[in-house]
Amino acid sequence: MAQILDQQNTLYEKLIAEKYLLLSDEEGLLFQQLSELDYFMRSEIIRFWLNQMGCAVPNESQMKEIDKSFFQSRQGANPVLKFQRDDGQNAGVVLSKYNNYLIAEKLDE
């Protein structure tokens, strides 16, 4: 059973990594394509992306705030959201939307 779970986890991680590569470039994440995904997949890709950058990975409450601010706001909105983890996990981050990209910048520590 443990072997099956390991294989499923590996497959899941590969799926997220492949989706991430399709939705990202050096500027950030492609906002329009990201917004077409369901909440769960979008959340996992954002978490993967931030982790790859060495930034804090949002908990579920923070992820809901990201989703509300960026993906449920009016079309022309350009929100900026700053967060960090209380546990000090990785660097804090500022998320913003610019030129159809979701952009992350590490907070100075």
State the predicted function of each range.
Residues 1-109:
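AMP-forming adenylation/ATP pyrophosphatase catalytic core
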